[in-house]
Amino acid sequence: MNPNQKIITIGSVSLTIATICFLMQIAILVTTVTLHFKQYECDSPANKQVMPCEPIIIERNITEIVYLTNTTIEKEICPKLVEYRNWSKPQCKITGFAPFSKDNSIRLSAGGDIWVTREPYVSCDPGKCYQFALGQGTTLDNKHSNDTIHDRTPHRTLLMNELGVPFHLGTRQVCIAWSSSSCHDGKAWLHVCVTGYDKNATASFIYDGRLVDSIGSWSQNILRTQESECVCINGTCTVVMTDGSASGRADTKILFIEEGKIVHISPLSGSAQHVEECSCYPRYPGVRCICRDNWKGSNRPVVDINVKDYSIDSSYVCSGLVGDTPRNNDRSSSSYCRNPNNEKGTHGVKGWAFDDGNDVWMGRTISEDSRSGYETFKVIGGWSTPNSKLQINRQVIVDSDNRSGYSGIFSVEGKSCINRCFYVELIRGREQETRVWWTSNSIVVFCGTSGTYGTGSWPDGADINLMPI
């Protein structure tokens, strides 16, 4: 090869290598620009929000490092867009209930600073469940705990902790309240907090940590609400509130709330005669509530709420095995779906049930006369057949020798269905246990399961003789 040919060959090879390097640099540049401007896909439309990181809100806080030759590129991961919950999935098919959580608050109070509470409940945001209760403004081992049997004082506040975390001194006080309800619409928490004088109380509506709206007493007789979770569908939250006699005719209204603002109020309609302390659950496209008739019936009222047109209907659970306390024994109790049964209707206790096709799952105290023991079961035809009494899948949650109290429902959305869970309030102290001067509670929580399960009893478990007086 002569010198000229060598020069041409070397030049050709050099040009080829230079071309390849140039193309590689272009590819790297294009990749860099593409990944850099990919972040603009993260921009949210006006009606979207960025999922907050807890406890400090940091958006786009995850960085993935990608190495290309000697170039380092930072690729931002888009934050998850948050939308309103619609609860459109079907209800989970269950065989019964399995243990989920127990906070042991009273036992822990024997040696620690734990709040005095009552009226607990559970509610979940899309990622986590929380327990709520109405605190008495004092811990148990504190002289202020004397005489905390009273329901309504200006010191009571709504407490909120992760489920399973007892209400210790670091617990957040969400609002001032002696009656409350809370729910998460998919974007933020709504808290309904009632406080004030019996004859002129105020309900405050707190959304995303801000006071947005309020309403005053409309019947001047202890404005009160659910003492369990409200329900939000597509941004509209519903809460049942009652003002009026606890043992006679009262004025019940259903409030529709959007981001903390009252947008509509519907009066109770249908055949229910008295409605208090409703336990509500999403039944897409509406909301269904099982409540307490404190006047005429030991069968539980049903309130059906249409979220789209604000219409309301009401009736009673058809099951002849009724859910309130006090009640007749199962042989003589009755319910015919439309009206109160007029069987030991005066007084009562907050409770729950939910429909399962034509059947009904329900919980109640084991005692017919007192808040002792707790059981769950399914009544075949209990949702559709008047006075149905065929009971299956009975479980004991708290044995009959131990105290129970209020109970309520909450719903948890899974990947393919919506599960129903419930909590039981385990009351201790006055009036029954007169060695001490306080009244407080712990809770136990169960959730629906499609699996098998065993037996047991999950009472509060504190030895009253070891407790502060």
Swiss-Prot record:
Q: List the disulfide bonds.
A: C92-C417, C124-C129, C183-C230, C232-C237, C278-C291, C280-C289, C318-C337, C421-C447
GO MF terms here are: exo-alpha-sialidase activity; metal ion binding
Could you tell me the EC number(s) of this protein?
3.2.1.18
Top EC class per UniProt? hydrolase
A Pfam family of this chain: Neur
What CDD domains does the entry give? Influenza_NA
Q: Where is this region: Hypervariable stalk region?
A: 36-88
Quote the record's binding site residues for Ca(2+).
Answer: D293, G297, D324
What residues sit in the active site?
Answer: D151 (proton donor/acceptor), Y406 (nucleophile)
The record's subcellular location field reads:
Virion membrane; Host apical cell membrane
Concerning PTM, the database record says: N-glycosylated.
| Activity regulation field | Inhibited by the neuraminidase inhibitors zanamivir (Relenza) and oseltamivir (Tamiflu). These drugs interfere with the release of progeny virus from infected cells and are effective against all influenza strains. Resistance to neuraminidase inhibitors is quite rare.
Q: Which intervals lie on the Intravirion side per UniProt?
A: 1-9
Q: Which domain of life is it from?
A: Viruses
Let me see what the UniProt entry remarks about domains: Intact N-terminus is essential for virion morphogenesis. Possesses two apical sorting signals, one in the ectodomain, which is likely to be a glycan, and the other in the transmembrane domain. The transmembrane domain also plays a role in lipid raft association.
Q: Which family does it belong to?
A: Belongs to the glycosyl hydrolase 34 family.
This protein is called Neuraminidase
What is the species listed in this Swiss-Prot or TrEMBL entry? Influenza A virus (strain A/Beijing/39/1975 H3N2)
Lineage runs: Viruses, Riboviria, Orthornavirae, Negarnaviricota, Polyploviricotina
